[in-house]
Amino acid sequence: MDKGLAFDHIHLISRDPQATAEWYQQMFGGEITAVQDNLRGAPQLDVRVGGMTIVIRGQRPGEHPSATKPIHQFDGYSSHDEWGTDHFGFTYRGDLRAFCAELKRKGVRMAVEPWEFKPGLVLCYVAAPDGVSIELIQAG
């Protein structure tokens, strides 16, 4: 039942929010739409990518963020192998393998190279700053 909900944002905590926002800008064509130098003790930037807002903020006083485990390729699937958010994903309309090659030329590390998850569905995982994993799915 629709209660008037709509997806709003993903919120990331970053060691270097400015550099992380610029990474999303450079690698995925994101647009920095808001910059706050000190929001409750930390800088925060909003980046619009693929119709979605990614909120990126720094460490606040008293916080001690821990890193997530890197994504791991198991037999037939990939996972961080821990509770909570595993990754977020974008659909890519085009040749995903060629797009990944372009990202690699820009210095992006592929956590999982493009592969056929099931017939007709190619996907991969990008290693983004701060241990974040981004799934890219070839639209088909």
Where in the sequence are the language-model features?
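Glyoxalase I/VOC metalloenzyme domain signal
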Residues: 1-7, 13-34, 48-111, 127-140
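Short acidic/glycine-enriched loop/turn segments that link adjacent beta-strands
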Residues: 39-43, 117-122
